[in-house]
Amino acid sequence: MENTFRPSRFLSLRATTPSPCTWEEIMQELTGERHAAATALFRALAAGEGQDAETSKRQQSQIKQNQPAFVPSVHLEGGRSSKHIKGYPGSIMVDIDGIPEEIFDETLERVRADPHSFLAYKTLSGRGIRVIAWMEGEVTEENFPAAWQTVNAYYARLTGIAIDRQCKNATRMSVICHDPDALYRPDAERMKFASLPSAKAGQIGRASCRERV
């Protein structure tokens, strides 16, 4: 199936004006050197290198807020709120966070190897994984929650890591950072509605995703 959807890119997390871009352009930003310095600095601060905790947290927030971001799950025009949604292309975002350090690499490889993973990369913190996968069939405002549940339950089972139910808003932004090993699979397999059982207890629904990067 041809994918013609152009996700909305924003100049920063504070920006409200969407600019359509291609998946290839997002991939080039992720794998190129444009955001390498900011990503490295953020991770150094997160590791507590050279700053007191309060100063480090403030600097991390500034870096994160200034990074560009994109909205992968809806077509937007004129803004970034629900009233600006013009369509649901079927692409669903997954936040995988809280991964124990000792199994992070294994978890990332499992995600990358899965044929449903369309886009996958390390988040700005270096401790999380962002995944985009596609649904088969029409996605609408009414069935978007079911589509989100289908995809997120799948990755919860695949990784054994809890997925936050509060991250299911369709206009959620994904920060663009530096990951030279980011995955882009244009021919990824699509998921079908109601083809998957519910995730195991504790795998969906946990702490707020507001601090995730």
Question: Predicted regions span which residues?
Answer:
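DNA replication initiation on ssDNA origins
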Residues: 1-90, 199-200, 206-210
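Hydrophobic, Leu/Ile/Phe/Ala-enriched alpha-helical segments that form helix-helix packing faces
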Residues: 45, 49, 62, 111-115, ...
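Generic recognition of flexible, low-complexity loop/linker segments
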Residues: 79-82, 118-119, 162-163
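Acidic di-acidic motifs
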Residues: 88-100
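Histidine-centered divalent-metal-coordination microenvironment in nucleic-acid enzymes
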Residues: 93-94, 112, 118-147, 171-177
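Short amphipathic alpha-helix segments
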Residues: 99-117
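Helical (often loop-to-helix) elements that flank the catalytic cores of nucleotide-handling enzymes
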Residues: 107-110, 135-160, 182-202
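Acidic carboxylate-rich catalytic motifs and surrounding loops in phosphoryl-/glycosyl-chemistry enzymes
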Residues: 162-180
